[in-house]
Amino acid sequence: MKALRWYGRKDVRYEDAPEPFPEAGQIKARIEYAGICGTDLREYASGPCMISPTKAPITLGHEFSGRVVQLGKGVKDFKIGDRVTGLGYWACGECYFCKRMQYNICLNQGFSGLTENGCMAEYMVAPHYAFYNLPGSVSYEYAALVEPLAVGLHAVRKSEMRPGDTVAIVGDGTIGLSVLLMALAAGAASVYIVSKHPGRAGIARKMGADAAIDPGKEDPVKQVQLLTGGLGADVTFECVGNPDTAQMAVDIARRDGIAVMIGVFDRAGPFHFADVVFGEKRIVGSSIYVREAEPVIALLADRRIDPGLLITSRVPLQEAVELGFEKLLKDKENNLKVLLKIPKKEDC
């Protein structure tokens, strides 16, 4: 089969790879679309980060849609031909956290496209519990967005946001805009986004943001205070993964407010806790998702959310490096979520 495989930094190849076979409890899916995530981009541009060099070559990708083509022994909750999407991680089911159904912080996690072969290929295999059935009303394109949308929903749930709350989001990537969609679906009264890319800020406004604040032109903390009568936001979300934007998210939150950290941080930084202490602010971590895939699929099926503006281009898998990874690195202004269309055998 054809696959997009990571060999090292700036070395990702479209090539032939062994076609996987499902073991007991696994499902084999024919992939329709795979999304390029910020994690994939980081591994391409500056990896290995989460990928072990000993795993190379490894097929990238954890955001996907497709259909079931083969069932491993013992799988009874799916059938051949089912349209599916799925999780990007696998849990052990045995550790302290798994026994408490906190699978997202499993001590022995495996990650599609990082520790195991992923979805940027004609076929992939994964444990049956990593798949979800799709209703006919959800397209393959939108289904490939379920994973990042689930990250957004999990963060909103962790924030304990209530209908009528004011929300501020620091970061204008796919996760930041997924949080925007989910906060609005959960009843946020106002949502402000801190965005340094005018193109992405425009997308955020079209998706429902009440204001987009450019940190290069104005102070986001002061601007949110102006917009909230001097209080600050009830809930803030950090979706960048930078110590400076983490501090910003805390500073934007009102007293007794909540700042949720979603971004993937690759370095430590100084942090001033005085405002947290005297303002009784709460800082909460949010890691991927647990039971959010099914609610996201329901929201898509009922058309209560429309993530179409997240998709800025669709490119063939064989052109993923130049038209996907490189474009995302060189032109963040006009590129957000790139979907890779997986070729059929006759196209290879």
Residue ranges and their predicted role:
Residues 1, 247-251, 290, 294-348:
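C-terminal hydrophobic helical "lid"/dimerization subdomain
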Residues 19-34, 48-96, 135-137:
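Glycine-rich beta-strand-centered segment in the early N-terminal region that forms part
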Residues 92-170:
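NAD(P)H dinucleotide-binding glycine-rich loop of Rossmann-like/cofactor-binding domains
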